[in-house]
Regions:
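Conserved ATP-binding/catalytic motifs of P-loop helicase motor domains
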Residues: 1-341
Length: 341
């Protein structure tokens, strides 16, 4: 499920700015998660932006924080609910099939109505000796340190030597606060260093073509240090050679504030739930017992990355892990109520 914003064209500057910030992982105007903007389509003078307010919130945004999710802001209401467009609820799921058991479980989870039977079904997917059997699955973690720790263990098991790609940054703002803010945002777009080696499982962090999108997984089969990485992406017919890409931080007026040049890859045996937002993962393993899971919507956001129940492995899930976002749920139900009137 998701919500869609329908906007008349041409868009006013406020709407254009907000859409840019949504699609570029902005902190303040993030609808509910870092990569909330799933797509923007233009059809007969209407732009459609879609996202889910019941997914994981942007970094630092909570029910009590000063900064709020975009749908709780005045500018959101003024721009998308009254002056230039409307918000509607999308029916159906784009990731899970209608006949799969995971779809019903997720629908109950997003509303905070998970049953004991649902939890038992999810925990039953791990099976016996799962710690050894599911190593090749993508393991989702709540914190970056936990994901990196898992990747470090897996990397050490490979015979090839690891290669590190260091970023090159260009900062175009001069004020100390702006520089600090730009560096923080660059870190969310691409890490300062990326470690790869032949045989490593990696994830693409940037969409390069219609057939090779952010979230694509593959295995490294060659590395040219400091220059390129050749990857066999799952489902892609031929190996792809990736070179350094430019990641930009821009302000509301589309002016570039900073750039980071980095290879668009990350080790992907383990990744954070926030990094996985927007990704469709063909094999997902989540051990809820190995680290803290305290944020609203974190469990739902993690489990919903899987396409089907038989592609998912879950361990240690408890009812206390399943937390909904009060404001997101209220907003979503308001849209439902408006549609019934």
């Amino acid at each position: 499920m998701a919500t869609a914003v329908l906007l008349r064209m041409p868009l006013p500057p406020t709407a254009t700015s907000c859409i840019h910030q949504l699609s570029s992982n902005a902190h303040v105007v993030s609808l509910s998660l870092p990569s909330i903007l799933l797509f923007v389509l233009h059809f007969r003078g209407v732009a459609i932006a879609a996202g889910d307010p019941l997914q994981l919130a942007a970094y630092g945004v909570t029910e009590t924080s000063v900064e709020v999710s975009a749908y709780r802001s005045r500018s959101w209401a003024d721009t998308f609910s009254y002056s230039y467009g409307q918000t509607v609820r999308l029916s159906g799921q784009h990731r899970q099939g209608a006949g799969d058991g995971l779809r019903g479980i997720l629908e109950r989870m997003r509303y905070g109505k998970t049953s004991d039977a649902d939890i038992a079904v999810l925990n039953g997917t791990w099976g016996t000796n799962g710690d050894e059997k599911w190593l090749e699955f993508t393991h989702l973690r709540a914190r970056n340190a936990d994901a990196m720790a898992h990747n470090k263990v897996m990397l050490a098991n490979l015979p090839a030597d690891p290669v590190t790609f260091q970023c090159v940054d260009t900062i175009q703002v001069t004020h100390e606060d702006q520089i600090r803010d730009a560096r923080t945002k660059l870190g969310k777009l691409a890490p300062p260093s990326v470690v790869v080696c032949v045989g490593a499982t990696v994830v693409l962090t940037r969409t390069l073509s219609a057939s090779l999108t952010a979230g694509a997984h593959g295995k490294v089969n060659a590395v040219d240090p400091g220059v390129s990485v050749m990857v066999d992406f799952f489902g892609h017919p031929t190996p792809m050679t990736l070179t350094v890409e430019v990641f930009c931080v821009k302000d509301a007026l589309e002016r570039t504030q900073a750039e980071r040049r980095q290879i668009p890859l990350l080790l992907a045996w383990g990744i954070t739930v926030s990094r996985a937002q927007g990704m469709t993962l063909r094999r997902v393993a989540i051990d809820f017992s190995c680290c803290e899971w305290t944020l609203d919507c974190l469990a739902y956001s993690a489990i919903s990355r899987a396409v089907a129940l038989d592609c998912l492995r879950v361990k240690g899930l408890r009812r206390s892990h399943i937390r909904t976002c009060t404001s997101g749920l209220k907003y979503y139900r308001e849209i439902e109520e408006q549609e019934r009137q």
